[in-house]
């Protein structure tokens, strides 16, 4: 039928487009060059995002750009969200790196990296401008910033699953999936294990 032919043509176009590149804006994009993903402005090239998030974004881009396979991309996201939700991610995959840009006492807004840096000072570690703070967000009471713990002192602590899903994974993956027609609610439902059938059937 005409509809089927139109749909097939659209699918071919999508596959060709995805293999060339993915553009969020002039300063945020990813392209395939010689089989490798080259990205600018996306989370996978920034150090203030957890390794598990950057790797997942890279894998999703590979599924879409290199293989033209949106179903595989969704399955990639599902698997990582499940690992996060069930507490099966290693601590080193959750480390966030943030650079100290001024003396700690000059910070008016006390972000997670500043809290973690102050905790490092309590252990006798000197923190100066330019120091890279490695920390994780752990489960507990208080704000996100208050629950930032230097990675070297996080042994035995349980990571905040909701933080890594809602504040790290969904924003980074959403950067890609929203342009394909998915919504934030779709990804939140996926994280909760709901409405997976409708997501799978999207394409």
Role assignments for model-derived ranges:
Residues 1, 7-203:
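DNA-dependent DNA polymerase catalytic subunits
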């Amino acid at each position: 039928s005409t509809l089927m032919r139109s749909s097939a043509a659209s699918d071919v176009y999508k596959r060709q487009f995805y293999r060339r590149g993915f553009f969020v804006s002039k300063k945020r994009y990813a392209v395939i060059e010689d089989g490798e993903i080259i990205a600018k402005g996306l989370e996978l090239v920034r150090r203030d995002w957890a390794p598990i998030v950057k790797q997942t974004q890279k894998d999703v881009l590979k599924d879409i750009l290199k293989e033209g396979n949106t179903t595989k991309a969704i399955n990639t996201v599902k698997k990582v969200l499940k690992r996060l939700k069930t507490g099966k991610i290693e601590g080193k995959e959750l480390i966030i790196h943030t650079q100290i840009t001024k003396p700690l006492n000059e910070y008016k807004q006390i972000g997670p990296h500043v809290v973690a840096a102050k905790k490092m000072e309590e252990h006798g570690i000197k923190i100066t401008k330019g120091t890279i703070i490695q920390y994780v967000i752990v489960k507990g009471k208080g704000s996100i910033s208050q629950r930032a713990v230097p990675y070297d002192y996080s042994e035995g602590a349980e990571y905040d699953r909701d933080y890594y899903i809602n504040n790290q994974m969904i924003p980074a993956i959403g950067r890609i999936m929203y342009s394909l027609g998915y919504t934030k609610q779709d990804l939140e439902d996926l994280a909760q294990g709901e409405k997976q059938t409708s997501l799978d059937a999207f394409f």
